[in-house]
Design a protein with these regions (language model features):
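Extracellular beta-strand elements of beta-rich domains used
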Residues: 166, 186-190
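Short beta-strand-plus-loop segments that form exposed binding edges in beta-rich domains
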Residues: 168-177
Length: 553
């Protein structure tokens, strides 16, 4: 594949709509849509094709909008079905996006797919709506993320009755996905689930069977009787025997024939020939390849108020009584009930053993984050431990590292992991603290810290640092172009300052925040588990250099 530089992507969009979609054509009139180019050139041809040329710059796109400031109502459908052919000599990744005018910037519907040269595929662009819209449209399906023949709920869903933009673009990954090439969108039509799946248009109640499955449909893998458990158990045992797992692996899943390192009895990291590796407790190089959430917790669903959804629920006084639970309403755990049906009274022990067998057979070697600690006790597969704790927050997804309880609460939670989740085990690869923190950037936290209350520990630290840097408030005001009467005035102010006003100081604070966070977390881990790894925080969104510099320390 050629290197990408100043290249162009040509997309030929054939707007071929079947006569069966006449209603959709009226709502979604492509020929009369307004064409907008962004770092691109596009035009309609006489044969109803739309030829688009995108340059390789990030963000290049062509959009279609309804004329006369109208919008398209697609609420009768569940998605778009798009037939695409790659007619270029390179791998490409078309991206189709829908937007609504009343949505936030981060709310949109999109989907994409890989296409090898000359390959044809059909892309399904599923429609997602917000929880509020779902509750209004489908009151018969309570507390669900989607029902039979409904759109699905997603946190960034949009109002599909009010679509004002359809965009065509491409995803560019250097040396893997080319931005140079052509593809044809051969056919576009809206669809409903009952048109493409084995779904009835009108769904009667109940719609969930005794095994927790969708009742009104046939599909591969569906359980039809108790005998299916016996049959599938034998099938899996035969498969595990035929595929015991990869050869040339240590008992930890490390690389037996690789360059041997020092055996320390615990996992550690080492840079070898310029590349960082895990090293297993016996000194073999280790590449962690795992899956999160290994265990037997799954389909624990609310029953109270929704009894009519379910067919043949067992009695609360039957042998399935342990799979009922209370709290915020009565619930039933179909996953555990089915494991009981399959493995009998020792289902927990058998399930844990089987999970280790499965991962090894599939070529995996790690019980990753949020896996069930009961599986760790068997000491057969390396695992990671997720650490969550209470703390005062600086932002919704960012703890305040200057909070007096920040470090102590992490330490206490680590001690709980030591007591209850086999934290001291040599099979413990390490600890993740927090999940997907929103680091954003200095400009975002400039607004957050300037608007924080006077008792926010991070703001107190920042103002103290400012007082040490600037001899007088007049000197600070001169630099920031502000009119604070004192440093205490900064502390009590809830005014959101512009990043440009105090860019240097805000950037310094951001770096200090990252340093403080990662240093405190690592110190907490090492204070309880001196021989185990701190694996970091897991990052959300774009990663900037300042956060990476702090994390790598």
């Amino acid at each position: 594949m050629n290197k990408l530089s100043n290249v162009y992507l040509t997309i030929i969009v054939a707007l071929v709509l079947l006569t069966s979609t006449k209603a959709f054509t009226n709502e979604f009139d492509w020929q009369s849509a307004k064409l907008h180019n962004y770092k691109a050139n596009a035009k309609f041809s006489e044969n109803e094709q739309l030829t688009i040329t995108l340059n390789s710059s990030k963000g290049a796109a062509v959009t279609l909008r309804p004329r006369n400031d109208k919008t398209w109502d697609l609420s009768a459908y569940h998605g778009l079905k798009v037939s695409i052919k790659n007619i270029s000599n390179a791998r490409i990744m078309p991206l189709i996006t829908l937007d609504a005018p009343n949505s936030e910037k981060w709310q949109e519907i999109d989907n994409s797919l890989y296409l090898e040269p000359q390959q044809s595929k059909t892309l399904l662009v599923y429609f997602y709506i917000t929880a509020k819209d779902f509750a209004q449209r489908y009151p018969q399906y309570q507390k669900m993320n989607g029902g039979p023949n409904t759109q699905m709920i997603k946190w960034d869903g949009i109002d599909i009755s009010n679509i004002n933009k359809l965009s065509f673009s491409a995803i560019n990954v250097r040396d893997y996905i080319s931005a140079q090439g052509s593809y044809i969108v051969q056919h576009i039509e809206p669809f409903r689930y009952d048109q493409i799946f084995d779904n009835k248009k009108e769904i009667p109640f109940p719609f969930i069977d005794k095994y927790g499955q969708y009742l009104h449909g046939k599909y591969p893998g569906k359980l039809n009787s108790e005998h299916d458990f016996i049959e599938r158990e034998q099938q899996e045992l035969d498969d595990l025997k035929a595929h015991p797992g990869p050869d040339n692996r240590s008992k930890w899943g490390g690389w037996l024939s690789g360059p041997k390192q020092k055996a320390t009895g615990n996992f550690y990291t080492k840079q070898i020939d310029g590349k960082w590796w895990f090293v297993d407790p016996d000194g073999h190089l280790f590449w962690s390849h795992g899956v999160t959430g290994v265990g037997y917790h799954g389909a624990n669903t609310l029953i109270a108020g929704r009894e009519h959804y379910f067919q043949d629920l067992p009695s609360k006084h039957s042998k399935y009584q342990d799979f009922y639970s209370k709290g915020r309403g009565t619930r039933f755990d179909f996953t555990k009930a089915n494991l009981y049906r399959k493995f009998g009274k020792n289902w927990q022990e058998t399930t844990n053993k089987r999970n280790h067998q499965r991962l090894k057979s599939w070529g995996l070697n790690t019980f990753a984050n949020w896996s069930d600690p009961s599986g760790f006790a068997l000491q057969q597969t390396p695992f990671t431990i997720a650490v969550h704790y209470k703390s005062r927050m600086l932002e919704e997804k960012m703890p305040d590292p200057w909070d007096k309880d920040f470090g102590p609460n992490i330490t206490e939670e680590l001690k709980n992991k030591q007591r209850h989740e086999h934290g001291d085990s040599p099979w413990n690869l390490g600890f993740f603290i927090n999940n997907e923190l929103h680091w954003m950037g200095p400009s975002s936290y400039a607004t957050i810290i300037s608007n924080a209350p006077a008792d926010q520990p991070a703001k107190i630290y920042f103002v103290d640092a400012l007082q040490k840097k600037y001899k007088t408030i007049a000197e600070l005001n001169d630099t920031w172009q502000t009119k604070f009467s004192s440093f205490n005035d900064i502390l009590s102010s809830r005014k959101k300052l512009k990043f440009s006003q105090f860019k240097e100081d805000a950037t310094w604070f951001y770096q200090q925040m990252a340093n403080k966070y990662y240093k405190t977390c690592r110190q907490a881990v090492k204070s309880v588990f001196p021989n185990h790894l701190y694996l970091g925080s897991r990052l959300h969104g774009d990663v900037n250099a300042m956060v990476l510099r702090a994390a790598e320390k």
